[in-house]
Each structure stands twice: as structure tokens, then as C-alpha cells.
Amino acid sequence: MGLSDKLLAVVDVACGFLNIDSWRFDTIMAAHGRPIATAVGVKKVRPENPVMAYIGDGAAYSIGMAETMHTAISNDNVVAIVINNSLYGMTGGQCAPTSLPGQKTTSTPRGKDPKKCGMPFNIVDAFSGMDIAYLSRGALSDPANINKSKKMVRKAFEKHMAGEGFCLVELLSPCPTNL
């Protein structure tokens, strides 16, 4: 797409920042849970640049849920790539709003009990009725799903570059080490 010379990425202080040394574009580190809101601010001062927030599910749907929701309501023209590993990975693998029923985590060693911890949050279900430019959920589980996910990310950036508004792509991803 030829965006790397212009792209500005905002990352969270959690797991998402661990790969920025391999990126070939400029990055900004935001406070925990605030990359999407920070990306909105960056886009307002640099409207000519493509702007992406790269954030985990815990930060986007827990500590940063207000920012995620407000950006969707406002339909601000930024891309959010949310890596959903179904737990709080950076702090040791605890149960998160996205943890699945029965999923074992460090804080739910017998598995998540929905009666005690609630059902997993699903962003596509929650935001499907909102007037945003693009919303999708992909998986990084095998080559076929990775290729589908790449197409989702491409479509989000195409809509973003056309100025259509908020684009959120959630990518289901394992966290085998619970960093």
C-alpha cells in the first residue's frame, strides 16, 4: 500500500510495544489503554498522515474502553488494530473481559466461570450497530486465517485513506508465554 513512509502508529505500553523495533514507520507510545484516543489526537494535528493504534484487548476493552467507545461514537478517522489474546498477557496471564468460558488463566486456574466473571466481551457484537467505517474480526491461527486477516487490515486502511471514519480490526492471537 506504500504507507510506511507516512504511517504514524500509536502503541500501548503493554505487549504491543514489544515489536516496534521491527516496524519501518514512526511510533508513539501512549499511556496504558489510551492509544486509540492518542491516535485521534495525532490524526487531528497530522490529518495528511495515516494513523493507526495498535493495542491489546485488555487495554482496548477494559482500561481503555471509554476511549474505544468514544472513538466509535465519534467515527474518528483512525485505524485500531486490536490484538485479542483473551487474557491480560503483560501482567502474567490473568482473566480478562475477553477470556473464554472455561479458559484457564493465572487468576482462574480452574477455568473462567461465566457466572462469576461474566461472558467474554465481543467487540463485533457490541459495535455492529454503530455507524463506523469498518469493523472486522480475524484470527492468526493458521495460514488461511492469516491471509484473511491481512485482507481485513488492508480494507481498514483503504477506508481510512478514503476518510470514511473509524476502522477497527480485532485479531485473535495466542499468547503462549503470558509475557
Locations of regions flagged by a protein language model:
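Thiamine diphosphate
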Residues: 15-89, 151-155
